[in-house]
Amino acid sequence: MKRNRKIGSVKPALTNTTQTTVRFSEVDSMQVVWHGEYVRYFEDGREAFGRKYPGIGYLDFYAYGYTAPIVDLQLQYVAPLTVNDVAIIETRLIDTAAAKLCFEYIIHRECDGALVARGSSVQVFVDSDGNMCLNNPTFFEEWKRRWLTKQ
């Protein structure tokens, strides 16, 4: 059963856009970007997102005594990238009350705007004892108040 959401009731997501130029070492024998590189492009997007919205980068997690492993990753390939193509990576944080980080990604080819790939990832918080957190860590709640209430 679908929920009936009121228009405007969903908070706008935080987004960041970054780019990368495809290197020769990233293509396979078919001269297109090897499928595993798209996962790295997603990570490039998350890292750039963390620089734009400080406080949720990997080093921040470590400083607070947490890690945030990926527990789910979805990726759909739409069109190829080749050497020297510039990939535009849009990364969007999807706000959730659950103790996790949900990101969506869209990758376009700069030269023609073509959609290349899209996907999503889910990360959970794990404390220094190796336990998965059932509630958001305090630092993340503070980060959310800082950045998500500015929207």
Where are these regions (language model features)?
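Terminal targeting signals and extreme-terminal segments of soluble enzymes
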Residues: M1-I88, I94-C102, I106-Q151
